[in-house]
Regions:
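N-terminal nicking endonuclease/strand-transfer module with a His-rich metal-binding environment
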Residues: 1-121
């Protein structure tokens, strides 16, 4: 599996992209680390951005603090949601983002299931 990595300056844009997939029934949140869950279970871009903001403020010189990973397991791999979550957590740990806040989205908008992970540098 080869991850696609993009970085950017606007956390709202990448979170909105993923929220649209969730609201359209083409995706869902698999896991959130370091981001408080709401009592109503809904995803809040504002609260997520606030959790990320603490980390981006630590190094204001970073021009593109948002990192977005797309992980595409082989279509032949029939991984459970628990396995996908573990795969995402292991990936983030190995990339050095294991202690950062991040959100793992599962997308099912194309022929294969894939994950999008949003975090900050």
């Amino acid at each position: 599996m080869v991850p696609k990595v993009t970085s950017g300056a606007n956390v709202y844009g990448v979170l909105q992209y993923n929220r649209i997939k969730v609201e359209a029934g083409e995706g869902r949140i698999l896991y959130m680390q370091g981001i408080p869950e709401r009592s109503d279970g809904r995803f809040s871009i504002e609260e997520c951005a606030e959790a990320f903001g603490y980390y981006t403020a630590l190094n204001p010189r970073v021009r593109k603090p948002v990192v977005h990973f797309s992980l595409n397991p082989s279509p032949e791999d029939r991984l459970s949601e628990a396995q996908l979550t573990r795969l995402a957590a292991e990936f983030m740990e190995r990339m050095g983002y294991g202690r950062q806040p991040y959100v793992v989205f599962l997308h099912e908008d194309i022929a294969r299931r894939h994950m999008h992970i949003v975090s900050v540098r």
